[in-house]
């Protein structure tokens, strides 16, 4: 079985995030513009589960899900924090939270 990082790939530049699925039979590519992001959530997994990043944009009610085991996700998480789309202190708390804890930025009103 191939590792998730072999077929789920995340790249970004100054304008967009690109999510590519290169699994045979189900290739796809999605782009998310930085300027369209309205909320980011981080969900901790358990010992055998990947943590997950959820990105919400203006144009759709559902989020984009990016498992932290995907290739490029560590750099993406750093860029999300650098762009102030997630508070740095809260990001540390989110990553260290108990299993299955969801932390969002900005926090719910």
Question: Language-model features: where?
Answer:
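Extreme N-terminal tail/first-helix region
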Residues: 1-7
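Phosphoinositide-binding peripheral membrane targeting modules
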Residues: 2, 13-44
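Short, exposed beta-strand/loop patches in secreted or surface proteins that constitute
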Residues: 7-13, 56-57
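Acidic, Ser/Thr- and proline-rich intrinsically disordered linker/docking segments
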Residues: 28, 38-109
């Amino acid at each position: 079985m191939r590792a998730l990082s072999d077929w789920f790939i995340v790249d970004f530049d100054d304008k967009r995030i690109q999510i590519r699925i290169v699994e045979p039979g189900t290739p796809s590519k999605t782009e998310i513009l930085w300027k369209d992001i309205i909320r980011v959530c981080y969900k901790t997994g358990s010992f055998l589960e990947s943590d997950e990043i959820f990105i919400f944009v203006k144009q759709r009610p559902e989020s984009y899900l990016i498992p932290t085991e995907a290739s490029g996700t560590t750099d993406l998480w750093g860029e999300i924090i650098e762009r102030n789309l997630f508070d740095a202190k809260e990001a540390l708390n989110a990553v260290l939270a108990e299993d299955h804890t969801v932390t969002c930025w900005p926090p719910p009103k």
